[in-house]
Amino acid sequence: VPLIIWGCAVPAKDEEVLKKICETCEGENLIIGPVEEKNHKGIGAAAMGYGHTIISSSPIDVNLAKQVNILLENLGVSLDKVIVDPTTGGLGYGLEYSYSVMERLTQAAMTQGDDKLQNPMINNLGNEVWKCKEAKLTIENAPELGDPERRAILMEAVGAVSYMLAGSRILMMRHPESIKLAKAFISLLADGGSAMDVAPITKRLDDVEIDFASMAPAADLTIVEEKKKAVKVASLKEED
């Protein structure tokens, strides 16, 4: 089973710690990341020298993703030992942006034959989902968002399915129920069947009751007749 060592995304600190890990675990072929443009020399050289795989990370941009791979290759790292982290967004605008960039990376690699982008992609989804406030809001603070436990699990599961469809090959997830739902989706794609047969989320917290009807605004059933627009008639002037 491959072991992924993920840093704290502070380039200077990651370089210091991950270099030491590369040395200590020589020959174990760990997956080391995130490696950014700011620290690619130190971590890249250590990973290459001690036989590890690198996660090249860039901030949701096709050109920057390619640039980091080029820098690593110039350093002497084989692109066969590189996994691309395009940077992962949670649900909402962040997910759509990441999804779009991943599609463009795939298109550049497959249709344009760009050999600097023909690498598997990884998404650190759990980190992004579980740190956002929507995943942590209680029923008292946000009753309109529904059951807090199911909400956060579904946020991670929906993100996982979306990134798989965008071409992700490795998903870093946290909640067992989210992982179960993602695996069920893979099985449905591979073997067919109905999503109705997928086991529901197993709750570990107390169930909650939410009266959504009481939160809905009063229905306005007033029918207002639309005013007809006045027809402008242009006056024709006869020329002498």
Regions found by a protein language model. Give the residues of each.
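Extended, intrinsically disordered, low-complexity segments
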Residues: 179, 183-240
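Short N-terminal secondary-structure initiator segments
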Residues: 22, 29, 71-74, 207-215
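Catalytic alpha/beta core domains of metabolic enzymes, predominantly
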Residues: 38-185
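Alpha-helix-loop-beta-strand connector modules within alpha/beta enzyme cores
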Residues: 1-4, 22-27, 104-123, 190-205
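Active-site beta->alpha loop and helix N-cap motifs at the rims of alpha/beta catalytic domains
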Residues: 1-63
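Acidic-enriched, low-complexity/disordered segments with a strong bias for Aspartate over Glutamate
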Residues: 14, 61, 80, 85, ...
